Amino acid sequence: MQTIEQQITNVIEESLIDMGFELVLVKFKGVNSKVVEILIDSLNSEKVSVEDCTKVSRTIPAILDVENLIEDASSLEVASSGLERPLVKFENYNRFLGREVKITLKELLNDKTSYQGKIIKAENK
């Protein structure tokens, strides 16, 4: 079964691509998870502007209302993924080859969960 974040991703991702944006992450935050935060990035490598976030924030609620996914949410926040954007999809690792990254693992690897280094290769095994 998909999480609500995955369901929202499935519903809005194509619309964001049509608008020229990549959906980076959907997450709930705030007290009782009443705030839906959507992080976006530009598909054409330009910086995401405040106007871009406003445009997306006016489009997404209509899509979510039709699908009836976040009826209990009190607000929707759209923001640029920024300089410290999370690398969520495999394609992100190839896009950022050669860049310095901080990685946080869910499980211990060699007695650590945090690593820092440069992405030199990305393989999907």
UniProtKB/Swiss-Prot annotation:
Gene Ontology biological-process entries: ribosomal small subunit assembly; translation
Membrane spanning residue stretches: none
Keywords associated with the record: Cytoplasm, Ribosome biogenesis
Primary location recorded for the protein, binned into one broad class: cytoplasm
A cellular component annotation (GO) from this entry: cytosol
Subcellular location as annotated: Cytoplasm
UniProt-listed Pfam families: DUF150_C (PF17384), RimP_N (PF02576)
InterPro entries found in the cross-reference section: Ribosome_maturation_RimP (IPR003728), RimP_C (IPR028998), RimP_C_sf (IPR036847), RimP_N (IPR028989), RimP_N_sf (IPR035956)
Record's keyword annotation contains Cytoplasm: yes
Annotated function: Required for maturation of 30S ribosomal subunits.
Similarity comment: family membership: Belongs to the RimP family.
Protein name, as recorded: Ribosome maturation factor RimP
Lineage: Bacteria, Pseudomonadati, Pseudomonadota, Alphaproteobacteria, Rickettsiales
Originating gene: rimP
